[in-house]
Amino acid sequence: MTRSLKKGPFVDHHLVAKADKAVTTKDKKPIKTWSRRSMVLPEFIGLTIAVHNGKQHVPVYITDQMVGHKLGEFALTRTFKGHPADKKVQKK
């Protein structure tokens, strides 16, 4: 189920404050955040936000096509290393 339009997008207040400060000072350093649940706003376009994936902060450059999505969508939390090789099957 999607979020109701009358509620508006959810963004943590500290993230909005850091983004506004970065825009006014034209700071290019990544903004570190643990808030994967925050939605990408149009004010974030052009900023680099380092989203925590549970282990490290993944830098995400915000483009106009990301607006409306959650930050957590762009920092994957699971890594797939492949299935183990079957020892019974011998390659010819």
Curated annotation (Swiss-Prot):
Species, as recorded: Variovorax paradoxus (strain S110)
InterPro entries linked to this entry: Ribosomal_uS19 (IPR002222), Ribosomal_uS19_bac-type (IPR005732), Ribosomal_uS19_CS (IPR020934), Ribosomal_uS19_SF (IPR023575)
Keyword vocabulary terms for this entry: Ribonucleoprotein, Ribosomal protein, RNA-binding, rRNA-binding
Gene Ontology molecular function terms on file: rRNA binding; structural constituent of ribosome
Protein name: Small ribosomal subunit protein uS19
Pfam families, per database record: Ribosomal_S19
PANTHER family, per the entry: RIBOSOMAL PROTEIN S19P FAMILY MEMBER (PTHR11880), SMALL RIBOSOMAL SUBUNIT PROTEIN US19M (PTHR11880:SF8)
Classification via Gene3D superfamilies: 30s Ribosomal Protein S19, Chain A
Family per record: Belongs to the universal ribosomal protein uS19 family.
Biological process terms in GO annotation: ribosomal small subunit assembly; translation
